[in-house]
Regions:
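Envelope-exposed proteins and targeting segments
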Residues: 33, 38, 52-54, 111, ...
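Divalent-metal coordination cores built from histidine and acidic residues
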Residues: 83-89, 95, 99, 103-150
Length: 150
């Protein structure tokens, strides 16, 4: 088996990459137009309160307007989502992480959309760039510093 180890690892890595890419392509969405979330119970982080009956409009992956239900003009052709009073929170940050390819979907499932990697190995930034593409699901990663290679 030792003679085959390198080939086996390469095949395992290739299979895992294909699985991650298939998962990302099946679950990732990039809306072409505006997205409107209506009737949300919005968490206001500046006032530390919930704002019931709130509409939030997103365009090009950014929040472009927030207001009470019925107070904002809805862009033509926008995808509309009825939050039905459910809570709407901003994406959460985890400021002390050591992410890897397998942890990406777990962060997102927990509402964590951005992380800071506290001690990246020299090859880790390139490895985790797949989160910015459709190759793997994961949060935005900010690197605090990189461990110097020897």
């Amino acid at each position: 088996w030792q003679v085959s180890l390198t080939a086996m690892r390469a095949e395992q890595d290739a299979q895992e990459a294909r699985r991650r890419t298939a998962q990302a392509q099946a679950l990732r969405r990039s809306p072409s137009g505006a997205v409107v979330i209506e009737h949300a119970n919005l968490f206001d982080s500046e006032r530390m309160t919930m704002r019931p009956g709130t509409t939030v409009i997103f365009a090009q992956q950014r929040v472009v307007a927030v207001g009470p239900d019925g107070s904002l003009p809805i862009p033509a052709g926008a995808e509309r989502i009825d939050a039905a009073g459910r809570a709407l929170l901003p994406g959460l940050w985890d400021l002390h992480t050591h992410p890897d390819l397998d942890s990406g979907p777990l962060f997102l499932a927990a509402g964590v959309t951005s992380v800071r990697d506290m001690a990246a190995e020299p090859d880790k930034p390139a490895l985790l760039r797949v989160f910015d593409t459709s190759e793997a699901l994961g949060p935005r990663v900010v690197f605090a510093f990189s461990i110097a290679s020897s």
